[in-house]
Amino acid sequence: MSGMGVLLLVLLLVMPLAAFHQDGEGEATRRSGGLKRDCPTSCPTTCANGWECCKGYPCVRQHCSGCNHGK
């Protein structure tokens, strides 16, 4: 394999891992094939406005989706 091929292979392996890193309020972790985020403690478990529980965290059935304390 040429040097360029090895570099491409390394980039293809590293890029998906970098996608799990998030800046801001949540910390990304991979669990059981899905992406779960640790929500800020100030983020409610239910959605007051019906579409977003806190900045960037969507609601599913009135609960914060993708967060450890939301189902």
UniProtKB/Swiss-Prot annotation:
Modified residues (Histidine amide): H69
Entry remark concerning the domains of this protein: The cysteine framework is XIII (C-C-C-CC-C-C-C).
Protein name per Swiss-Prot or TrEMBL: Conotoxin De13.1
UniProt modification remark: Contains 4 disulfide bonds.
Modified residues (4-carboxyglutamate): E52
Signal sequence segment: 1-19
Species the sequence originates in: Conasprella delessertii (Sozon's cone)
Keywords: Amidation, Bromination, Cleavage on pair of basic residues, Disulfide bond, Gamma-carboxyglutamic acid, Hydroxylation, Secreted, Signal, Toxin
Location of 5-hydroxylysine modifications: K55
Modified residues (6'-bromotryptophan): W51
